[in-house]
Amino acid sequence: MASPSHPSRDCSQVIDHSHVPEFEVATWIKITLILVYLVIFVVGILGNSVTIRVTQVLQKKGYLQKEVTDHMVSLACSDILVFLIGMPMEFYSIIWNPLTTPSYTVSCKVHTFLFEACSYATLLHVLTLSFERYIAICHPFRYKAMSGPCQVKLLIGFVWVTSALVALPLLFAMGVEYPLVNVPSHRGLICNRSRTRHQEQPESSNMSICTNLSSRWTVFQSSIFSAFVVYLVVLVSVAFMCWSMMQVLRRSKQGTLAAQGQQLQLRKLESQESRSARRQTIIFLELIVVTLAVCWMPNQVRRIMAAAKPKHDWTKSYFRAYMILLPFSDTFFYLSSVVNPLLYNVSSQQFRSVFGQVLRCQLTLPHANQEKHLRAHVASTMDSTRSACRPLIFPASQRSSSSARANMVFLSTFHSEAKPESKPQELSCESPEPNSERKPANPATRNGFQEHEV
């Protein structure tokens, strides 16, 4: 008999054995999902494969740092594994034919573990890529000490090891079991199920599904809730790093515009490419945050629903809400891996151009230094021609106008600000004449000194 504190009740709203076949969705949903999954699978595999090739081309041509390339390649590989490991098995065992016998326990465990590991590898890759850009933009001096092939390998290794640890509990908590088996020592609803068919032999009637094992309920709950915390931490961290990077770029822009003088105007011109690349990175990371929030949240809600209470305590409305959410959450989750190549194309015109070239198998991208070397060579040739055709001593007005134009072309070939070691060289370039007027920031004076030396 039930204890007086927990009287036996007839829970008419709680699901029973008659609802177990409803774990299999309707036929029209199956057909719709197979078409949607097929499109997502092809686009996802193709997009991420081309992304790997594009990043390698950009890195070889000098447009992308090797550290960023390694992160993007590893992220694309994790997305591809999500499709290869997760989509076929999940569609067959959860959507198309969820009701089976306990003989598929090993495949259920292995699939769940690998799928969870690859999914969170994608999530953590977004975190490490954001962290790498955050250090490069907000802490550039630390970036040189923290960047490098060894550090990148350690970060990527950290991602995969952590993902495996996050997924490891599911290797023990998942299996093939009748979904309405009572969880031992669980204080849930106490209902009179004497008139239901819970005591039938589900093994003989093919009523088992790949689900959490009742004997490992605590392990399953801990795994799902811990993974959800990891998801929230990644979202908050990436959002914070994007906000910090935007603040740094905004302060840098305001400082350049507020300054006066020829030298600071040249600094604005020479750093325009680097600031444009940084803006593209931030746009990409912002879109990644939105994607993670929109595409991952339905799947996280469904997982929380599964871990909040055992299935034998689910009400009919709770069960129907779960089954309605199931196809939508899975579809949006796979879209998060499809959308990464799309975000690369949206946030970077250069990436979009090379992406199209790779699809057409016609690579026409020149090396990044080719145009710079050409401009420098033309500027050097013109400067040598002028120096050979004019006298050594010029009036101050002519020297100022001509040398300012020459230095404008010369300094435009640089893409980073002068290092502190270059300051003594600027001081040594002053004219030795005591009566001459000179300003350290005036490019005409420096060019005049070069003519004086000639």
From Swiss-Prot:
Residues 56-69, 132-151, 243-283, 345-454 are cytoplasmic. Keywords: Cell membrane, Disulfide bond, G-protein coupled receptor, Glycoprotein, Membrane, Metal-binding, Phosphoprotein, Receptor, Transducer, Transmembrane, Transmembrane helix, Zinc. Pfam families: 7tm_1. Zn(2+) binds at H17, H19. GO terms for molecular function: G protein-coupled receptor activity; metal ion binding. Detected in liver, kidney, abomasum, uterus, small intestine and colon. Residues 415-454 are annotated as: Disordered. Glycans are attached at N192, N206, N212. One of its GO terms (cellular component) is plasma membrane. It is a multi-pass membrane protein. The keyword Transmembrane applies. The keyword Flavoprotein does not apply. PROSITE patterns: G_PROTEIN_RECEP_F1_1 (PS00237), G_PROTEIN_RECEP_F1_2 (PS50262). The chain crosses the membrane at residues 35-55, 70-89, 110-131, 152-172, 218-242, 284-305, 324-344. It comes from the Eukaryota. CDD domains: 7tmA_GPR39. One of its GO terms (biological process) is G protein-coupled receptor signaling pathway. Residues 1-34, 90-109, 173-217, 306-323 are extracellular. Disulfide bonds join C11-C191, C108-C210. The modification Phosphoserine is found at S397. It is found in: Cell membrane. Belongs to the G-protein coupled receptor 1 family. Zinc-sensing receptor that can sense changes in extracellular Zn(2+), mediate Zn(2+) signal transmission, and participates in the regulation of numerous physiological processes including glucose homeostasis regulation, gastrointestinal mobility, hormone secretion and cell death. Activation by Zn(2+) in keratinocytes increases the intracellular concentration of Ca(2+) and activates the ERK/MAPK and PI3K/AKT signaling pathways leading to epithelial repair. Interacts with HTR1A. Interacts with GALR1. This is G-protein coupled receptor 39. It comes from Bos taurus. The lineage of its organism: Eukaryota, Metazoa, Chordata, Craniata, Vertebrata.
